[in-house]
Amino acid sequence: MAEVQPTRMELIKLRRRIKMATRGHALLKMKRDGLIMEFRQLLEEAKEVIGGMVQKYEKAQSKLALAIAVDGIVAVRSIALSCCQIPPEFSMKRKNIMGVVVPVIKREPIRKKPTERGYGILSTSTRVDEAVEAYEELVDAVLEVAEIETTLRKLIEEIERTKRRVNALEYRVIPTMEELAKFISFKLEEMDRENIIRLKKLKMKKAKS
C-alpha cells in the first residue's frame, strides 16, 4: 500500500475497477448457477439414458446366447466379423451451452435391413437376426451415452473454472481493492487535515504580523 500514490485520481480509478470487478463477479455467479442447473438437468437425462443402455446390453447378451445355442459359436463369430466390415456412420457437430462448446453426435440409423448386414440371411436362423438387431440398438445407445458423458465432463470443468474465478474476485481481488481504496481515502483525509492546520497557522502568522 505504501507504493500506491494516494491521489484523488488514483481513488477514482480504483473505484471504477471495484465497480467493474463487482459487476463481473455478479455475471460470473449467474453463469456458474446457470451451468449448475444445466448440469443437473443433463445428469437426470444421463441416468435414464445409461439405464436404457444397460437394458439394451442385457437384451443383446441374451439374444447372443440364444443365437449361439441355435447356430453355434463358429457361425455367430463369422457373422459378427461380417457385420464389423460395415461400421456405423456418424458425424460430429458442436453446440454452445452458456459459453461451453460441447459435441453433438449426428447419427445415421444404426439398424440396417437384413440384406445390408453383410451375411447370408438364408443360411442363418432368426435368432441371429434378432441378436444383430439388439447389438445395433446397443451401439446407438452407447453413442448417445458417450455424447452425454462428454457434455457432462465439459460442463463440470467449466463450473470449476467459473467457481475459481468467482472465489478469486469475492475473497481476494475485490477485498484487496476495497482495502486499498480505504487506505487512499484515509491518506487523502489526513492530507486535507494537515493542509487545514497549515492554512490556519499561516493565517495566525499573518494576523500577528
Curated annotation (Swiss-Prot):
Chief localisation class: membrane
Compartments in which it is found: Cell membrane
GO cellular component annotations of the record: plasma membrane
UniProt KW keywords: ATP synthesis, Cell membrane, Hydrogen ion transport, Ion transport, Membrane, Transport
GO BP terms, alphabetized: proton motive force-driven plasma membrane ATP synthesis
An annotated Gene Ontology molecular function: ATP binding
Record's bilayer topology term: Peripheral membrane protein
Keyword RNA-binding on entry: no
Gene3D superfamilies linked: 1.10.287.3240
Record-linked PANTHER family: V-TYPE ATP SYNTHASE SUBUNIT D
UniProt similarity note: Belongs to the V-ATPase D subunit family.
Function: Component of the A-type ATP synthase that produces ATP from ADP in the presence of a proton gradient across the membrane.
Subunit structure as annotated in this protein's UniProt entry: Has multiple subunits with at least A(3), B(3), C, D, E, F, H, I and proteolipid K(x).
Record-given protein name: A-type ATP synthase subunit D
Name of encoding gene: atpD
